Amino acid sequence: MENDPRVRKFASDGAQWAIKWQKKGWSTLTSRQKQTARAAMGIKLSPVAQPVQKVTRLSAPVALAYREVSTQPRVSTARDGITRSGSELITTLKKNTDTEPKYTTAVLNPSEPGTFNQLIKEAAQYEKYRFTSLRFRYSPMSPSTTGGKVALAFDRDAAKPPPNDLASLYNIEGCVSSVPWTGFILTVPTDSTDRFVADGISDPKLVDFGKLIMATYGQGANDAAQLGEVRVEYTVQLKNRTGSTSDAQIGDFAGVKDGPRLVSWSKTKGTAGWEHDCHFLGTGNFSLTLFYEKAPVSGLENADASDFSVLGEAAAGSVQWAGVKVAERGQGVKMVTTEEQPKGKWQALRI
């Protein structure tokens, strides 16, 4: 365009922008010179394409098909113990129609029945453990129309309470979340520390590797009740075999207890007396035996266990036995006494 007659005329008239344009080209002009040239020659600016935010539209699939195959645990011997690899079901997450998350937690210690329902039996024979591989798999069982989200996070402090809001949950490093109808995996970094297998007495901070935090929120009222399953996939080293151990947890109502962590007790002051609740920390079938030094207001009764049967009399110097089937962690039985810390003993056994 530098040969345009108009450019030659402006150059002959001494216009600096025209002279420079003829000799060196349009690209060498300054912004002000280009503006002057356009005005002099009546050149209109070309429209500039404006950036537009890219939106990717996703459609939920009509159906998702997948298959999971359970395998036998792999066990190998080591110099001072064994190495075991396996996969176990922790829980089934349920919908939560609230916008704030509802939490379910799982303590990471081989003696924890609510997390490791198979590993607990073998771990009871060893003094120490070390996880060398640890990950958690969420497997959906809800349709693709299910709303809200599911999140998994790991906290190294097993005694710390869950986050108090959604922002705190997502502030946890490594937190993974997705819609309920999509599966995902949370991989937890392990360390080289040997920890003690919990005995039900020690401070959890000294024996537990941490805890898994599971959260659900935002589901609709008409969504499926069950969202999906959470499984743990692990490789653990068990060290320093201790020999024979008890499969039963024993204790009294003063809080002294020993053995694997099968149950936890809580108490509240009611109108009829002190209400004692026994919560089972894992699922399965349990035997619970109580010895009363003093007659209670009421003996063993079902609170929310899936199945319950009781034998024996709730009287002074008597023993009551209950068979309890637990389908969900935290289900349990109850009794009422006149004393906050009644004299007596109890034994819990997984059968």
From Swiss-Prot:
Gene3D superfamilies in UniProt: 2.60.120.20, 2.60.40.3420
**Listed GO molecular functions?**
RNA binding; structural molecule activity
Query: What results from changing residue 28 to S?
Result: In strain: Infectious clone UK
Which coenzyme or cofactor does it need?
Answer: Ca(2+)
Motif mapping: GW motif? 25-26, 273-274
Result for mutant: residue 13 to E: In strain: Infectious clone UK
Annotated Pfam families: Viral_coat
Q: What is its main location?
A: virion
Question: By its UniProt entry, which SUPFAM superfamilies does this protein fall under?
Answer: Positive stranded ssRNA viruses (SSF88633)
Per UniProt, the keywords (alphabetical) are: Calcium, Capsid protein, Host-virus interaction, Inhibition of host innate immune response by virus, RNA-binding, Suppressor of RNA silencing, T=3 icosahedral capsid protein, Viral immunoevasion, Virion
- Outline what the protein does: Capsid protein self-assembles to form an icosahedral capsid with a T=3 symmetry, about 32-35 nm in diameter, and consisting of 180 capsid proteins. Also acts as a suppressor of RNA-mediated gene silencing known as post-transcriptional gene silencing (PTGS), a mechanism of plant viral defense that limits the accumulation of viral RNAs. May suppress other innate immunity by binding to host TIP protein, thereby preventing it to migrate in the nucleus where it could trigger an antiviral response.
How it assembles, according to the record, is: Homodimer. Homomultimer. Interacts (via GW motifs) with Arabidopsis thaliana AGO1 and AGO4; these interactions inhibit RNA silencing ability of host AGOs. Interacts with host TIP.
Which family does the record assign? Belongs to the icosahedral plant coat protein family.
Q: What is this protein called?
A: Capsid protein
Q: Which organism is it from?
A: Turnip crinkle virus
